[in-house]
Each structure stands twice: as structure tokens, then as C-alpha cells.
Amino acid sequence: MTRRELFTAAGSAALLSPLMEAAPAEAVPNPRGHLGMGGAPAGFGAWNAAHASPGGGRGRGAGSRPFLEGFFDYCHSLGLGVAEAGTPPTNPDDVHRLRDKMASYDMWVIFDVGVPRDEADVERFDAGVKAAKEAGGYGLHAALTQRRYEQFNTLADYQKSFEQNQKSVALAEPILRKYQMRLALENHKGWGAVEQAAWLKRLSSEWVGVHFDFGNNVSFLEDPMFTLETLKPWIFSCHIKDMTVQPYDQGFLLSEVPLGDGFLDLKKMVDTLRAKNPNMPMDLECITREPLQIPIYTDKYWVTFGEMPPRQVAHMMEIIQKNPPKKQVPHTAGLDPAARLKEEEDNNIASIRYARAHLGL
């Protein structure tokens, strides 16, 4: 299937036709099949733009993206072995076609089924998990939060949101157990590693764990290895990425960069996770965008955190000082759609090649 056919099948050829000619994808051979590196939609901005649905998206509970069969095909065309592909299909023909593709491509799929908001929403969640099971999903992913330091103005507001997250997952757990489907909760700039670990320890369910993002908790002044080690007992799956940090007047700028271009010890992190589970899905999420502002010198940043260990803060300041960007970090402001897609694909292909050569992915 060609790149044009992929976009057409996804219903977005008219929107993206100028981009397809400007930035052709380049497949990277995948010798590991479903054990090779996968793809997360946030790292593929053209797909996010083409398939955004009103009220959907990450961090919105029940609002999840519709099934992205085109993205599943696109990941295969790039040499990726796993795809995070929205909500599961329910039409029997679509389910059979997906199962056939998973077998022929030797790929896995991870679905997003929004957790129940309340008791009245459990029936919808049950139907979604059942559909994911019937479609052959490896598991479920959920990102329940936005950026905590931007979203909330008081500690009480954050605590109310966290309580709702815990209630939703508690409602979801019996359904997950019923269908024996695992739900992996992403550390999505909402909870610190210690908070998330304590919650999962209290929940004590083999069906609820972590979708570990390699870089998100840098925004909480956490060393990525600390985050990994703290959450490791519960990690089911991952978003692999590399990060750079650089100072600005209100704190530091945080950017995803191609694998190998940042300060993360990727080999150590991958080896640690492979030792836990040699078959763990690791999905590439190199988001090509403007650097994120982490305003640690403002009162607004700290209002939801309470006390943070001084040594933790000092360690992150040392990382910022000693790890300037190795290359120009991605910037997208002012780029036309074709140039943005070209930069994104270049970054993703570079990351896939690095993962093949240096990480065994």
C-alpha cells in the first residue's frame, strides 16, 4: 500500500494531498515484527490533525480517538511493529480485516478506551473493552491528565481531579478483570512518579499498570531513571523518546528530539525495561513541536506540588546546566504544513534508525 493509498483509506487525502508529495515516508526494515518499536499517534502530527474528533483526544476520559486503521497501516509502512490506534472497531468486517492485518504484518495494536466517568458510564466502557478483546488488542492505553502546572490554579483543584482519576479507574478495574485486558495509565504530566506508584500499590490490580513515558516527568523535575525505577513494578508498555532541556527566563524549555540527540540514557532505560519484560511494547513518540515551557520560577508552577525534595530540584538544575542541546531543537512556528510534516518524518526516521542500530528495537 502506498502512502497516498494510506491517507485516502483514512479519509484524509484531500486534506493532506500536498504533503504526500513533499514528504514521502521511508520504510526502515523491521526484523523483530511485533517486538520491534511501535508508533504513538502524538508523534505523527499529520495523523493527529487529520483524525481529531470533537470532544476527543488524550486527557479527556471517555473521549477517545476513533479507530485509525490508516495509522496502523502507516506504522507498518515505516517498519514499526506496534500501533496505538484509537478505539477498537466494532463492525465485524473491520474486526476481521484488522485481525488479518495483524497476522500478516506481524504487528500488535494497543487501543484507547476512555475510562468510565461515573457508574452510568460503566456500560460504555464494558462494551469498549469487549471490542478491544475481540479485535485482538495487546492492551489498553489511557492518558487521563493534562499538564498539571498549567491546568490547575490551586492544590484543591488538583486533588479533586486526582480523586476523580482514581474513582474512574476503580470503576474500570472489574471490567478489565472480567475480560482479562490490561490498562496502562500514562504518566502524562499529571501525577508525580511517587503519587502514581502509591496509587497503583493501593489499587493492587494485575490489570492496571503504567504506560511509561520516558520524558514526561522531567517537567516535574524528576530524573527519568528515578521515574522509571519508581514505576517499574507496574509498567506494561512505553512511549520511548529522547529529550533536551535548555534554560529560559521563567524556567526551562523541554523538547522531544530524535533518539540519541538528547540527554536520556536510552540504552540503560531500554535494558532495564527489557529485563522486566523482554516483549514489552515500546512506542516511538517523538513529538515535533515548539519546545514546552516549564515555568519553575513562577508561583503558578508550584501551587499544586507542595514540598519537593531540594536534592531533586538541585539534580535537575545540574542536568540542565550540563546537558545543553547537541543540535538545534525542533521548531514548528512559521512552518507550512509540508515543511512541518517533512521535519516530523525526518525526526521519526532518524529515531527508528537509531533504535535499530543501538537499542535492539
Predicted segments, located by residue:
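Twin-arginine (Tat) signal peptide motif
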Residues: M1-F7
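Active-site acidic/histidine proton-transfer and metal-coordination neighborhood
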Residues: P18-L19, T90, K101-I110, P116-G209
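Hydrophobic faces of well-ordered beta-strands that scaffold small-molecule active sites
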Residues: L35-F44, A83-A85, V109-V113, L140-A142, ...
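Active-site mouth loops of central-metabolism enzymes
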Residues: A40-P66, D112-V122, Q159
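Acidic-and-aromatic substrate-binding clefts and catalytic sites of carbohydrate-active enzymes
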Residues: A85-V95, V115-E123, E150, N187-V194, ...
